[in-house]
Amino acid sequence: MLGNMMDSPLLISGLIEHAASSHPTSEIVSRRCETDSKGESIHRYTMRDAAKRSKKIANALIKMGANPADRIATLAWNNYRHFELYFGVSGIGSVLHTINPRLFPEQLVYIINHAEDRWIFVDLTFVPLLEAIQEQISSVEGFIIMADSANMPDTSLKNAICYEDLIDNASDELEWPHFDENSAASLCYTSGTTGNPKGVLYSHRSTLLHAMSEVSREALGITSLSCILPVVPMFHVNAWGVPYAGAMTGAKLVFPGPG
């Protein structure tokens, strides 16, 4: 005999939905690579805003032809756009591949090709890295530059798209799909092993269980009253799961940005 209480899969999309409904006004502060019209690099918004923009990026990816299990990469710092991608990519069943920009160029080529990434979201800082290797990464169909139109660089990257333009044209209405909670949610490659970097896949279930453990009093004790600055890079073991824990509890998140 099986119990059926709360018989629903543990999915990452559930975290951002919970954040939007239970902690809508919790603040997310982020330092950007670019500045706004006033010369400010600090960006502020709420969990509700992040949830809407996550749905926008999800809808944009679906329109671009993203499928479940497709690998979609990021080459980015800890910032609010990267946070949106944590949910927008994995939420539709695609796999978020967070790339460590501190790897050697030949290692970047190896892991992008090995993962067979279809698109790469890239912060302004790392555009030159990709320009130098773009002819060697055959699976990549295009690059989404994480900036607004006013700060788009003059780049040789083929099929370069502005992040803000992409989501401006997308709807924030989306019913997140349900699928097996053991499906891959994110992909990280090792950076300190012998030979080529090794890929490690995290499931939706493992990610949520890790976040649940992390917020406990016996671990980090994260609550809605907490203010957290994730120093661990979002390309390193998913910043130790802190972005997910922030969404789970409604803690204030402060992303340090480039550097």
Model feature map: region roles:
Residues 71, 77-97, 101-105, 113-119, ...:
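A short helix-loop-beta submotif of the ANL/AMP-binding
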Residues 208-227, 235-259:
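Conserved AMP-binding/adenylation subdomain of ANL enzymes
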